[in-house]
Amino acid sequence: MQDINSGSSSMKDTYSSWIEISKRSLSNNLDNFRSILRPNSTLTAILKSNAYGHGIEPMTRLCIEAGISRIGVNSIEEALLIRNIDSKIPILIMGEIQNPEKRKNVLSDPNFWIVFSRPETARILSSFLPAPKLHLKIDTGMGRLGSHGETLKQTLSELKNVGITLGGICTHFASTEDVLEHKYSLMQTQKFEEAIFLAKSFGYNHLIRHACASASTMLFPNAHFDMVRIGISLYGLWPSIQTRLSLNLTGNKNFQLNPILSWKSRIVHIQYHPADSYIGYGSTFQTSYPTKVAIVPVGYYEGLDRKLSSNGDMLVLGKKARIIGRICMNMTMLDVTHIPGAEVGSIVTIIGQDGEESITADDLADRTHTINYEVMTRISESIPRIVVD
């Protein structure tokens, strides 16, 4: 993936499409989260999955420049990309590490904070010199990684018996984003507090405690503990409409998020077709009037969902242009009959704002029956990311 700073943005004229990342909007989002954080809690920027499609390398640089002191990722590979940019920033690795003994050379980093579920993993990692910091994962109701009940007690006992040092303890909320009534999340918070107390009974005091992601950070200030993990909303996207409504119900109606990503391309060809012409693979679309068709060099390889075929729009010169026919691997056709000025070279906005019109990740998610997370993370890493403003 190409990471291009604002000084090189004129190069975008040669790309089939490009991503623009707004430094100003990122700063606004960070300021808004910092304004609601409990005093002793630290914001960790989650940059996993190519920074939710925004580009892990440019986002790392922007976050560090904005004062972020901790970064979270899913994998060793992502952590190493960040380590190449900053040699000392603490990096939380949240995904399960397989065969850690085979990665000793890269995992021997005291500023890697590694989340683990199994005591075997902790034994291996703690033998490294220098050893990474270990964060024990608690399953409070997600039913995924971590342990609970008797298994948790056995894990803590085993860790204590072999003298393993812990640096942190963490959990993850299962359904905060999906509901307006948060009984389950409150139950998870209680279970996490019980797990913290249990860890103390084994002598594990002064651990870095963290539970909240974006939605829970907004809604549960009592669960901020020592650290929060901000992912989707770092990029200016709401985790769900339920999250936004829940926040309004708490009386906080002023919290704002600003999407930081725009995805753009250009028209590369114009065709004029008479009525009753077929457009695209499978001849699934037939014109009903003389139609001006614009070709955009973006398709499902680049991350545009094929379910948007004849079911979505792009923006051209501040107006919506309907996608017609099937989205191809690397091309999409638009009806620009109503946009006289549309021509080869005209900028096309796939996600973002043009004049008074906008197309958001949520718009695309609604059309394709998915979530904004998937819309963003499926944008191809091959598309250059350019930092603007």
Curated annotation (Swiss-Prot):
User: Catalyzes what?
Assistant: L-alanine = D-alanine
SMART domains on file: Ala_racemase_C
Q: Does the keyword Isomerase apply?
A: yes
> Which metal ions or organic cofactors does this protein require, according to UniProt?
pyridoxal 5'-phosphate
Listed GO MF terms: alanine racemase activity; pyridoxal phosphate binding
Which positions are annotated as binding substrate?
A: 144, 329
Q: Which GO terms describe its cellular component?
A: cytosol
Q: Which GO terms describe its biological process?
A: D-alanine biosynthetic process
Query: What is the annotated role of this protein in its UniProt record?
Result: Catalyzes the interconversion of L-alanine and D-alanine. May also act on other amino acids.
Q: What is this protein called?
A: Alanine racemase
Q: Which organism is it from?
A: Leptospira interrogans serogroup Icterohaemorrhagiae serovar copenhageni (strain Fiocruz L1-130)
